[in-house]
Amino acid sequence: MEEHIRTPIVCVLGHVDHGKTSLLDRIRGSKVVAGEAGAITQHIGATLIPFDSIAKMSGDLGRLKTSVPGLLFIDTPGHHAFTTLRARGGALADIAILVVDVNEGFKQQTIEALQILRTCKTPFVIAATKLDKIPGWRPTPNASFQKAYKNQSERVQTECENRVYELVGKLSDMGFNSERFDRVSDFQRNLVIVPVSSMTGEGIGDLLMIMIGLAQRYLTEGLKTTTSGPGVGTVLEVKEEKGLGTTLDVILYDGIISVGDEIGIAGSDGALSTKVRALLQPRPMKEILIEDQFMRVKSVVAAAGVKISAPNLESIVAGSPIRVIRGDHDEVLAKINEEMQEINIKLSDVGVSVRADTIGALEALSNELDAKNIPIMRASVGPLSRRDLIDISVIKEDLFKVALCFNVPLLPDAEAMVRDEEVDVKIFSNRVIYKLLDDYLEWRDEMIRAKEAKQFETVVLPAKFSILPGCVFRMSGPAVVGVRVLGGTLRPKVSIATRDGKIVGEIKQIKLNKETIGEAKEGAEVAVSIDGVTIGRQIDVGETLYVAIPERHVKVLETEMLSHLNAGTVEALEEYTGIFRKTQPFWGK
C-alpha cells in the first residue's frame, strides 16, 4: 500500500475584525489563472493552494525543496470551524494561523483562540495583519516582508519593530517564546510571527512558505496517507441542497472515498451506515456560468473537501466522524460510537444546560465553562426543544434554570413556550463563545447581587450598641435615649436583647440630627426610641445590648452572607450566638 504525504489542513483563527476573512480572501484570490497547472482549486468548504502557487508568491523562499504538496485552507475562519473539525479526539487542523491586528494587539478572542490551540496541541503561526495600517507605511504590493520593510523610513521601521515586540511581550506573559520569522533559528522553541498585509499582499508569500516549511520539518509523519486505504473524515456541515436533499460537507483527511462506498457516520442516536450516492465538488471558475454549481466525481483522495449525497442523512450532526466501511461493518460503527464517547465534557448533578450546533463546539464551550467553574448538568448537539425547557424548568436553583445556546435555534414548540411564558427558563444565545459566557456571567452576577440585596433587606442584621451617659431623654413609653453603635448595623423594628439573651424591647425609630433614618452603622451616635422598657429596670445606661436575631436568620447569615459582613458585624454575630451556644452548641446551625 503506497504512502504519500497529503496536503496539511489549515484553519485561521483570531479576534473579530482582525483580518481572518481578508487573509483568506487574499490567499484564495492570488492571481493564478484558473485551469493552468498548479492552479488554486476550490473544494467543498476548503481551498487548495498547491506548492507551485506558493513558490511563485514567495520569491527566493520558493526554492525550498519539499514533499508537502500544498496547503488546504478551511474556508470558514474562526474558532467555530476549528472546534467543529475534530479528528481522533483532537482538532482536525494540522496547523493553524492565529491572526492578530499588529496595531491593536491581543483581544479577548485572540486569547481564547490561543487557549484552544494550546489545549488541542495544534502548531500555529502568528500572522500580524494590517501592516499597511502602520502610520506612514509605504506599500510594496506582493513583496516579501523584508523587501517591504527595507522600503520604509527609519521611523516606520522602529514603529513596526515596537508593535511586533508588543506581541512578543504579550505571548511571553502567556508562556510562549516568540520572534519575528526572519530572526528565528529554532522553530521548535519559538513561535513564529509573520507581519503581513492582506490589502497589499506584503508578507503573504512568507507566511505560506513558513507554513510549508513547518509542515515539512515537523508534520510529515502525521501527514502520511494512502490513495487506496478506506477514507476517514469529519463532517463540516449538514446542508439541504435543491435536487439532492440532505447532504454532508466533509473534510477527508485520510484515504479515499468513492461513489457506491458504504460509509459509517454518527447520527443523533448513534452510529449508522449508508451508501454514497454521489460525490460533488465545485465547478472550476471558468465553468461558473453553468447552472449546476457542482460537478460529480467518482472518487476523492485525502486531503480534500467534498459534498456527499446519500440516503438517511437527516440525523447526522456536524463535527461527527465519517469512515468508509470495507467488510468490517460492525467494527467501524463501534469505532465511531467510541469516538463520539471520547468527547470530554464534565457533567455535574446540578448546573447549566448547554446546546451547540456541532460536537466540537459543544466541547469547546464546555471547556470554557469548566475554566470559569460553571457546572454543566446537560450538554447536547442540536436545537433547543420543548422537552429541554420542561426539564430545565424543574431545577430548584434559579442560577441554573438556564440554557446556553451556541449557534443553535429554538424548535417551534420551544419558541411557543417561551413566547407564552409557560416556563421560567432563562435562555442565552450567541454565535461567539466568549459573548455567550459574558452574557450569562453578567446575568448571574446581577441575580446574585439582587438576592444578596433582598437578603440584607429581609434578614435581621447583627448589631451591638450601648446607651450613652447623660443621653436619657425619656425613661419609658417609649424610652428615648442616645446610643453608640459598637458593631454591625442598627435598624428600626428589631427586638433587642441583653447580654444573657433575654429579649427586653423593640427599637421603633432611629434619628440623627432630628431626622429619621433607616439604619445606623458602626461608630454612629444616634437617638433611638425603644418600646417595652424602662431605663433603670430592664436596661441601664452604659449597658451593652444586642439586636435579637431569630435562630433561622442566624443560619442564613452564617451559611450564605458571612463573606459579605464586615468585621464589626461578624463580631456582633459571634457574641450574640455565643450567648446561646454555651448551653445549646447547635443553636442557629
Curated annotation (Swiss-Prot):
Q: Residue limits of the tr-type G domain?
A: 5-219
Q: Where is region (G5) located?
A: 197-199
**Assigned keywords, A-Z:** GTP-binding, Initiation factor, Nucleotide-binding, Protein biosynthesis
* Domain of life per record: Archaea
Q: Which positions bind GTP?
A: 14-21, 75-79, 129-132
Task: For the region G3, give the residue spans.
Answer: 75-78
Relate the protein's function as given in its record.
Answer: Function in general translation initiation by promoting the binding of the formylmethionine-tRNA to ribosomes. Seems to function along with eIF-2.
- What does the sequence similarity comment in the record state about its family? Belongs to the TRAFAC class translation factor GTPase superfamily. Classic translation factor GTPase family. IF-2 subfamily.
This protein is called Probable translation initiation factor IF-2
According to its UniProt entry, this protein's organism is Methanocorpusculum labreanum (strain ATCC 43576 / DSM 4855 / Z)
This chain is encoded by the gene named: infB
